[in-house]
Amino acid sequence: MLLSDKDIRAEIDAGRVRIDPYDESMVQPSSIDVRLDRYFRVFENHRYPHIDPSVEQADLTRLVEPEGDEPFILHPGEFVLASTYEVISLPDDLASRLEGKSSLGRLGLVTHSTAGFIDPGFSGHVTLELSNLATLPIKLWPGMKIGQLCMFRLSSPAEFPYGSDRYGSRYQGQRGPTASRSFLNFHRTQV
């Protein structure tokens, strides 16, 4: 069941959902807006001949922070990692989806490529996968609204929520945009 504004506020007020910093004006009818942090991970395309998810490629990205109050410029066709300004913490019976903002999508900004789902038990900054599909550069201002979280109540609490030892939750407690850690539990079935 998708939570309404009333339910979202109740979960936050009860301390079951943590959004830090919390701004009540960000609550929408069935979601809560999240803002863009000031850190970005840009890809160093000259470091490797290809991307291989089965091995660690530590130098594949580098951290960039715009100076002062300057925006980050996302060029046409460019893909970068960023993160929410807010730290999000979910209980074991709520999951969430990060969706883009319609107004930004109409400018050509894609907020997440594939990973918009947030498991119950997750705590940390949510990494964003930003792409510019427009033909002009897009200014990304730290602190601007970048997406919205909708929350769903599970039919029962997760037996092994994100962060439990069972799944080796690679991104629990992440700070800022976190590069892929797919190599830590890469799985390939022989076909």
Curated annotation (Swiss-Prot):
The record marks G116, F117 as: Important for bifunctional activity. It is an enzyme of class 3 (hydrolase). InterPro entries: dCTP_deaminase (IPR011962), dUTPase-like_sf (IPR036157), dUTPase_trimeric (IPR033704). Pathway: Pyrimidine metabolism; dUMP biosynthesis; dUMP from dCTP: step 1/1. CDD domains: trimeric_dUTPase. It comes from the Bacteria. Gene3D superfamilies: 2.70.40.10. Belongs to the dCTP deaminase family. This is dCTP deaminase, dUMP-forming. It comes from Streptomyces avermitilis (strain ATCC 31267 / DSM 46492 / JCM 5070 / NBRC 14893 / NCIMB 12804 / NRRL 8165 / MA-4680). The lineage of its organism: Bacteria, Bacillati, Actinomycetota, Actinomycetes, Kitasatosporales. The gene is dcd.
